[in-house]
Amino acid sequence: KNVVVIGAGYIGVELAEAFELKGKKVTLIDAEERIMAKYLDKEFTDIAENEFKSKGVKLVLGEKVARFEGENGKVQKVVTDKGSYEGDLVVLCIGFAPATKIVQGKLDTLKNGAIIIDEYMRTSREDVFAAGDCCVVKYNPANEERYIPLATNAVRMGTLVARNIENPTLKYMGTQGTSGIKIYDQCIASTGMTEEVAKATTN
């Protein structure tokens, strides 16, 4: 009856909507002050937040989860640094991390474990290619390597591995981090940096 979704990125937001449409009482918690703060500017997250509020979804923003409480192996409450919220189901949507332990010490990676590749999808080891959410991507707006796990990136990279594995000729052009989401009747898309990030980057 009471569902708590922790993490208000794309997946958390989509799950919150899905549970609400199924008639559940939904609480959406995030440490950021806005939902989807890493992807969208405030003028757009305000629209999305108002949609949720109009549907009765409780938004708990700017709070960090401290612990879960319950009895007999069943969760009953989520406790944050500022309050507590009832929930008989808790879903964690707190981001991705590359599952690359198998290549630790064998391939060059970022600190988070994302495999570093060149423009042909080649790793630091000869004849070893990599693609998808385990890898870094060239982020064109900042002209740097970043970890951006998106299905669109993964599909392109997989195609490039297939094309280049015998004879590397087709270069990866990089990504703008383009993504989109539909929240109830609102369709929102973004590409490149948010205004906030762009200002911080140029300063």
Each model region followed by its residue ranges:
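Glycine-rich Rossmann-fold phosphate-binding loop(s) that bind the pyrophosphate
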Residues: 6-11
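Aromatic pocket-lining residues of Rossmann-like dinucleotide-binding sites
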Residues: 19
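Short, conserved glycine- and acidic-residue-centered signature motifs
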Residues: 12, 41, 150-154
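A structural signal for isolated positions on well-ordered beta-strands in alpha/beta enzyme cores
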Residues: 4, 27-28, 129
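A Rossmann-like FAD-binding core segment of flavoenzymes
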Residues: 22-117, 169
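FAD-site-proximal beta/loop scaffold in flavoenzymes
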Residues: 1, 72-77, 84-164
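Mid-to-C-terminal Rossmann-like scaffold of FAD/NAD(P)H-dependent oxidoreductases
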Residues: 134-203
